[in-house]
Amino acid sequence: MSKEPLILWLMIEFWWLYLTPVTSETVVTEVLGHRVTLPCLYSSWSHNSNSMCWGKDQCPYSGCKEALIRTDGMRVTSRKSAKYRLQGTIPRGDVSLTILNPSESDSGVYCCRIEVPGWFNDVKINVRLNLQRASTTTHRTATTTTRRTTTTSPTTTRQMTTTPAALPTTVVTTPDLTTGTPLQMTTIAVFTTANTCLSLTPSTLPEEATGLLTPEPSKEGPILTAESETVLPSDSWSSVESTSADTVLLTSKESKVWDLPSTSHVSMWKTSDSVSSPQPGASDTAVPEQNKTTKTGQMDGIPMSMKNEMPISQLLMIIAPSLGFVLFALFVAFLLRGKLMETYCSQKHTRLDYIGDSKNVLNDVQHGREDEDGLFTL
């Protein structure tokens, strides 16, 4: 193959590459009358070797068609109209075009051409601008009517009537003080609680709501007479709850007997309650009267040594476990002593064996030296 056709083919290829633009296209959509910015950036910008221009329509093979604005790498050198501006930093490669107050005639394709030294090195960026009219939006206002309805509810008054609870009654009886036999003291407690809840209409207090206190007579001996009288408030003893419409009576009776010597202190309490019934139509809670308590005085001539006596059964229950614990501790100590003695003896035997082995080794060494001395003598 001759050189001339080869050179011709290379020239055609280079010319085709030159005519083929290296371009990219960006679409920008904005509203008429608003400022528009067409982006164009070049990161490798050099103010000594680069320049650029903006033109209308597609980028041609060289230069800009209908040039709108032109720079020399540092500043704007020429512009077609005052509404075309470069508001970016040109030395840093930001040569984006800003169009102020665009009209419908400004729609179309724009060319950003950055001139780079060398063949076929220019950067071509095509930007398509679409301008639209501002859309009108109709706002509908919804009217809301609010009606307030006021409802008056009937007012009802509930009358609550409570009955005081009966206080616990303790009766202590003792026999004649001149006798030497131990006294028998019996305590009888009667506790009665009544709770009532009346209807909406006022009514009188039902008969079942009255606490009944009935002390049981003692069979152990006569009752001592009262020597002093003390009046206590009823609030410290009674607790009333209004939770149900029925009457609940809770009566508990417990009795416990203590054995005391003939010279022990004797006291007797006797309590009595009185209940006041509410009048019809009253809405307040009936207030119970104050309780009366009668307490007998203390008797003299009681030795303090009799109070500290303890039953033999309780002493045995304390002594027996203590004695068992001591015996168990002695047994454990005996077992541990046997194990310690066994360990000590085994260690001592091991030490004696070790000493015997050491002596045998020393004897063997001495015999070996004597044999060597005999050989040297010979």
Curated annotation (Swiss-Prot):
Signal peptide stretch: 1-24
Disulfide bond annotation, renumbered to this chain: C40-C112, C53-C64, C59-C111
Domain Ig-like V-type, residue spans: 25-126
List of glycosylated residues: N291
Keywords attached to this entry: Cell membrane, Disulfide bond, Glycoprotein, Immunoglobulin domain, Membrane, Phosphoprotein, Secreted, Signal, Transmembrane, Transmembrane helix
Topology feature Cytoplasmic, residues: 336-378
Phosphoserine modifications at: S358
PROSITE patterns: IG_LIKE (PS50835)
Molecular-function annotations in GO: phosphatidylserine binding
Domain of life from the UniProt record: Eukaryota
Chief place where the protein resides: membrane
Location within or outside the cell: Cell membrane; Secreted, Extracellular exosome
Topology in membrane: Single-pass type I membrane protein
Ranges where the record places region Disordered: 136-160, 269-304
Subunit (UniProt): Interacts with MERTK; this interaction enhances TIMD4-mediated efferocytosis. Interacts with EPHA2.
PANTHER family listed in its UniProt record: T-CELL IMMUNOGLOBULIN AND MUCIN DOMAIN-CONTAINING PROTEIN 4
Entry protein name: T-cell immunoglobulin and mucin domain-containing protein 4
